[in-house]
Regions:
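Amphipathic/hydrophobic helical signal segments and adjacent flexible N-terminal regions
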Residues: 1-98, 172-173, 179-185
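Short, hydrophobic/aromatic-rich segments at coil-to-beta transitions
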Residues: 38-42, 73-76, 108-111, 129-136, ...
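Beta-turn initiation residues at beta-strand->coil junctions
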Residues: 45-47, 115, 138, 161-165
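Short, surface-exposed coil-to-beta transition loops
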Residues: 56-58, 119-122, 143-147, 159-160, ...
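A short, structured loop/turn motif at beta-sheet edges
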Residues: 66-70, 127-131, 150-156
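Contiguous, well-ordered beta-strand patches that form the walls/edges
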Residues: 80-137
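Phosphate-end processing signature that detects enzymes handling 5′-triphosphorylated RNA
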Residues: 133-137, 141-148, 152-157
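Edge beta-strand at a domain terminus
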Residues: 148-157, 161-185
């Protein structure tokens, strides 16, 4: 892909330099944003399923960066667990009370080895709203998931809102307020 621009003298020139520079800036911004999320988080979440009453749940999320390896892409490990599981996971077996997802950042996509609602691998397309917020859009096993994640107050807090459609019907809306417990930086 090339960008056309005018030199101001009536001629148009093509350049891929502009696109390459934009791609480098975008990739650097994404790596920096993911780096800001590394650490242990306490998540207070509220789930809305169809017409049911809201359900509150607390869990912990630990995000760590893995060694880059030969691929040249940055990889991350997402671990989560609940200390008080209640009956939330018994009533909803597609949800996991603990688990791990390994994901690799490749350009504007996050390649997940598994997904939260499924063991299937998946690709999340990433859009950057500003330096503090990303939007992830994923499709796997008839699920369409839209997640907004925003870092707040110099990365002490995160706000996540997740909308999940199954077979084109909105099934789950989640609100997560997360507080950083441990920052390895």
């Amino acid at each position: 892909m090339a960008i056309s621009y005018s030199s101001g003298i009536g001629r148009t020139k093509n350049s891929s330099v502009g696109i390459d520079r934009l791609r480098i800036d975008f990739d650097s911004n994404l790596r920096r944003w993911f780096g800001r999320n590394i650490g242990l988080w306490h998540s207070r979440s509220q789930y809305f399923f169809d017409e049911e009453k809201a359900i509150n749940l607390e869990m912990y999320i630990n995000i760590s960066k893995l060694n880059q390896g030969d691929s040249g892409f940055e990889s991350y490990r997402f671990n989560w667990w609940c200390e008080d599981e209640k009956d939330f996971f018994i009533k909803r077996p597609t949800y996991k009370s603990k688990g791990e997802i390994i994901a690799q950042l490749q350009g504007h996509q996050l390649i997940r080895h598994s997904s939260y609602l499924s063991d299937s691998s998946g690709i999340s397309n990433i859009r950057q709203v500003d330096e503090h917020e990303l939007i992830f859009e994923s499709n796997y096993d008839n699920w369409h998931v839209l997640e907004h994640t925003r870092l707040i107050d110099q990365d002490k807090f995160r706000s996540r809102t997740i909308y999940s459609w199954f077979n084109d019907k909105l099934k789950i809306v989640e609100n997560h307020h997360e507080t950083r417990i441990k920052n390895p930086n």
